[in-house]
Amino acid sequence: MAAQEDRLDSFGMQHGILLSSSPSLQPPYNHQEYAWDFQRYLNKLQSLRPSDSESFRTEINLLLDQLISQDYTPGVTGIGQEEVCAILVQACRLVQHNQEHLVSKVCQLVHYLLNRLQVIVDEQNLDFLLAFSISALKQCSSWTHADVLHALAALVYNNGSKCQKYLNELLGPTGILVNLCDPSQPDPELWREAIHCMANLCLGVPGHPYLDEPYRMTCFKNFLTVLQTPKPNIVDDIAVCTLLQNALKGIQSLLNGSKIKLLETGQLGSLLAVLKKYMFHGLPGLSIEMPTVLYPTPLAQYDGRSPTKPEQPEAAVNQPTWSKKKRKAGKQKKGHQGEESKEELKNEIGAEINKDLEKMKLCSGEAQHSLYLGPQKSPLDPHQGQVGKDHFSPQVQRYKKINSSDSEYSDAEGSLQNKIRSFQAKVRQGALSCFLSTIKSIEKKVLYGYWSAFVPDISGIGSPQSVSLMTIALKDSSPKTRACALQVLSAILDGSKQFLSVADDASDHKRAFTPLSVTLASSIRELHRCLLLAIVAESSAQTLTQIIKCLANLVSNAPYHRLKPGLLTRVWNQIKPYIRNKDVNVRVSSLTLLGAIVSAQVSLPEVQLLLQQPLYSLSQNSGSATPSDPESNRKESMLEGGKKNGLHSEHSQSCWLIRLCITLVVEPREDSYSDSEPSSTPAVMYEPSPVRLEALQVLACLVKGCFNMAQSYLIELGEVACKCMQETDASIQLHGAKLLEELGTGIVQQQKPDSIVPINLMVPINQAVTFWNMILNGPLPAALQNEQHPTLQTSACDALSSVLPEAFSNLPNDRQILCITLLLGLNHSENPLVKAAAARALGVYILFPCLRQDVMFVADTANAILMCLSDRSPNVRAKAAWSLGNLTDSLIVNMEAMGQSFQEEFSDMLLLKMLWAATEASKDKDKVKSNAVRALGNLLHFLQPYHIVKPRFCESIECAIQALVSTVLGDGTMKVKWNACYALGNVFKNTALPLGKATWTAAAYNALTTVVKACKNFKVRIKSAMALSIPFSREQYGSTEQYCDIWNALVTALQKSEDTEDFLEFKYSASLREQICQALIHLLSLASQEDLPRIRKTLLEKGDSIRNYVLHYVKSEVQGDESQREHQDRGKMLQRAIEHIRGFEELPGSNKGLIEVAYFEAILVSCDKEMEAL
């Protein structure tokens, strides 16, 4: 040990950083020896007592040096949290604050052990160590403070929630860290370390309380001050970078850990300004001056740049003369045409890259200093690591010059420069990460006010290109920084569909100003141009993946139907070659991008044409670089083979993308990529699982959005789904089931009554039967019974529910029974997802014509649904309520089609159970309630007189109607209220119910009249007015007072039909007035003599306003023959109501020439005159 101690004496510390000897000079220690030594040092420390003697100082100084000199590694047995805390606490107990040299050494030990061994101090020991450190800052000389702050930063790391006791001393108005963070601080090192401590304090730990608001704002202001300081008083560039990094990390922690109110404090513009500034920190050739605050505006932000020298004219000499090579192409012999055309393609793309890079220059002289991405790998020739010599742009040639061995500075200087560039890149990454957290902490509508500050736009004539996130993506030398910028851009684009929907450049109308729609359109075009350029220029596979993902996000949100066509074609043609890239993630993201195009824009003619491109175009140039390698040739031969051997030859509307995805999913690989991911099985080499999964998702998108094209591959896609469901990979099985569901749904959608697909272009019923026979004789039944994979069972249930009803009825009897048996069995599953899916599937099957008239199936389904309605899972109850609504719909259809025979055959006890279950469900959550009230309306409509007279039904009827009334008047969603009003209308249709006489009549009418007058949602008002017009006899409206209340409520509702706070509701006001007028005329046609005085009073008081609305309703301002017919129908309704009122004139004691008759006859006369004039 003596020799070891002598060696350790040579170690020293400077500014809290251990300057140790090389590890090669130290003897190899095993972990056990380190643990023994550590325990021995602890025992020595525990044997000492605090003293001020020279011998004590010497001994403890030696012990501390020995501890600091050890090369500890995390995870060593015997050196854990308990041992480290024990040795630190003991060392602090022994050292007194007047022993400043030892205080510094102890702090170095704290920092070293906590960082080296990655230990988080427990709360009790933390309390002691914090007290020691804070006292040291108060009592010791300033030369020790740097080491103390080092220790403090290590102590508070991830311990902010445990430091509440000391926060006021550290972060209060006169706190130690606050005072040290003053930019005028004479020692900039202390400023840097204080910011470091603050940043570590701000780190949030999930599940623990965060800093209080005052402390958060104190930290935020200090971090912002650091970032706003023009040039910190620190000579060392690396130290400046660490200061900036800590400030950025601190703000990021504040944004991630708490909802800091940037808008309320007015700090958002200031924060965004400094973030934009440091996104470009140290980027060669760029010196940007930012305003202190960015303001939200659709216009370009102020962008100050340092003046630069004009570019030397000889730079143009380096431009390759592509046109000469093009002219030479025609002189080549025929045998060399293939290679020459390929060379032409390279030249064209190189020229485009050069042209675009020139546009991206920030200033004329920056190219001389630009460390651009460097020589990039061309997708044209995967066997080359870089573009050919003649194809370098001037920027790349300069890059080669700067990085050559002829550099003007020495190796040591170069190493330092590289280190500085590395730290500057970390600052840029920190600014981008902080910006990403800022985006997540503010509303998108606020963020889009700053769109022009961060998203590129096409520059005006003569003006330079403004800096943006794409500047970093194209010009930063660090792949990680480029990826960060693209991540931020993706976050901005995510959810931007509504904001970008106003973009429009399809019409070339010249204006005196540039509207927002044109500005956004040009921004979208510039984004496409820059991202496509970045794809060609990128050399890092990881960053390339991020570019393609960002492009997919843009495609998902851009309104291409309002933009000039061609953008998607360029994206499509440029991304196709990357489907065969050697990197798995690049291939996956390329498929994701194609899927985004298909999902979001499939209806565009441009996309339809792209999907119908011939297969051979995949290997030809389509305006972008196209790789050519053995793997691509293999895929093309497989595609052609599939075309010749499969069903593809019969396809009237072929789609190369479907063929490609089928190939990627099911065809084995003949040779392997250099992928990091292993193959699926050792025997058969398939594409890596992520590629196959993405290909399946693209197939599902194609089937969903472009079924008219996919239906040509129906049987083949069914085979693909079956093959996937038979594999061992659970994810592949699941996506196979989802593809199957989309295929089934596509067939069903085609056959709907409102489908616009011509009958001759629909999938024939016999083909649908063949398809489902194949599926049911395949892996679907096994998937439904796979209890080890409940997610697959769920998807299989959803797939089974997508059977076409007409196809189901034509399936063999045993297959039908199999489907029903499996679904009824899965209804008892213990997994809520499976149970919910089975309940929903039964709700679909109950509407099948061949099943809904089967009383036994209806009864079995009802019992299964009733069981699910009492499940603990809200999702299961919601699906069960939906299915119950469908089941009761089928009861009404059967009642109308089969008459009383079906009602008598259906079990009274089961009907009563359903009534009670629906009543209880109407008190559940809104998702359950909306369908429960729908079921109640149907059940009350279904009841017959012999049901109603039974005592056990009387109570249930009254409770059910009370539940509907409560729902109408309750605070549920508008969908719930709408369904409840609809349900009450259904109740009124049942003539067997004692409407008008029962005690619940008044409550039902009161609920509807309340809603028709005051509900904010006009659709609910319309449905309530419709319900009020359903009763067909005067007796059903109850007493004269009840009748007149309904009449007055409708008149009031008519007058308020244009009163709304929500502009979106205004479009329904015309429909509302029509429905109210119809209800008023219906009431008038049923009025009794006792009702007339109230009606007359209303007409005298509000007659003028009512007249205009009724006149408009009857004449129906629609042109053409249809308006004549509609006018005649409505006119007849009013005429019948007038005749009904006129009948009272002949009664004894009645007034002749009733006001009501004259009033409405005048309306009819006015209508007739106006219609005759049409």
UniProtKB/Swiss-Prot annotation:
Q: Pinpoint the residue ranges of every HEAT repeat in the record.
A: 168-207, 460-498, 523-560, 566-603
Task: For the region Disordered, give the residue spans.
Answer: 304-346, 373-392, 619-648
Q: Organism's domain of life?
A: Eukaryota
Q: One matching Pfam family, short form?
A: DUF4042
The encoding gene is heatr6
Which keywords are on file for this protein? Repeat
Q: Which organism is it from?
A: Xenopus laevis
For this entry, the protein name equals HEAT repeat-containing protein 6
Spell out the Basic and acidic residues composition-biased ranges: 336-346, 631-648
**Transmembrane stretches, start-end:** none
- Bias-annotated ranges (Basic residues): 323-335
Gene3D superfamilies recorded:
Leucine-rich Repeat Variant (1.25.10.10)
Q: Which InterPro entries match?
A: ARM-like, ARM-type_fold, DUF4042, HEAT6
